[in-house]
Structures are given as structure tokens and as C-alpha cells.
């Protein structure tokens, strides 16, 4: 088989670079408000993509971490309720109960569904006390929260593929929660600052997974408010 000619290699690299540039376009800004939305089941896919982010850390040893994180905001949860109620044929009463539970959950904590894969399976241990990973949530002011819980979730494959399709046969799924600080807790404007950053840090580096509001003040302006 003939080797690829130099011009072919250059063209291939150019195409790869162009594709990479397109795939790394900035995600759309989101709406952190509690606006009520009339989502249909067919809206779920686009809403899911809007609230899901992807980040990857690569070193000489391979992929240190690759993660797909979905922030379970009230906007996302409304689309989830619509899709879940449609799939499982919920009554109006059961749907209303589910919607209220989702609203209460969104007000109690910042919750993320995260699918993670690593080159070496033993690195994928975010939930362990001995894990080298430090997981934190930051906002536009630089305020930081530690997680209330990090749990490995083993969901039925048909369910997870339908509701969190970023999963693959190589990923491990986590539910990561950060409780909203009470009135006497540390100041954390959170989504009100216009930005949330889910950070995964280890000795080899870190990834920041970011959600920005459609319009928000700068970090300096937020800190001065």
C-alpha cells in the first residue's frame, strides 16, 4: 500500500484542524431563572444538549479524564418531567407531583449528572475518600463550594441511554450535588452570578466545565454587588 503523499498529509491535517475547531465551538448560554416553560417531549433532546457540557484532559499517559456533565437546572428538569411523563404515561396528578419534587430539588442543591471515562479505570474513582480528584463548584465571583455528595449511579441502560445519552460502555456515571448554602452559610451567589464552573482537579491537571448565563456581570462587578 502506497504511503500518503506530503500534500495528502497536509490536507488531512487541515481537515482535522477545521473539524476540531468546529467541534470546540463555545456552548450556548443558558437561562438560570425559574421561568415556567411549556416543554413538549420532543424538546428534550435539544434542552439536554443545551445543559450538557464536555471537557477533556489529555497528557502523555493518555486521557486523564473526559467528562460529560449535565446541570440539572429547573429549565432542564421541566423538559425531563415532560419527557418522563410522556414515556411512562403519568396522570396529570402524578406529573404535577413529579414537577414539584423536581422544583424542590433544584432549590435545595446544584445537581449534576456526570459521565466520566479515563484511560485507566482505577483513575475513575471520584466517589472514593482516597480519590486524588478534588471536585468543586465555583461561580463568577470566585466563590467555591465543596460537594455534599458524589455517588456512582448504576441506572438501567435503556433509561440512561434515553435521558442521558452521553453515556458509553466506557463511562461511569455519577450524581454530584452541592447544597445551596443556608442564610448562615458561606456566601455563594452561584447561578445568580451568571456563571457556574464544575471543576475536576488532580495532580496531572484540571478541567473546568462552564455554564454561562445569556447575560451576566463580570466577576469583578459580581464581587462588588
Predicted segments, located by residue:
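C-terminal motif of bacterial Sec signal peptides marking the signal peptidase cleavage site
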Residues: 18-21
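Bacterial N-terminal signal peptides that target proteins for export
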Residues: 1-11
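Conserved functional micro-motifs across diverse proteins
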Residues: 23-225
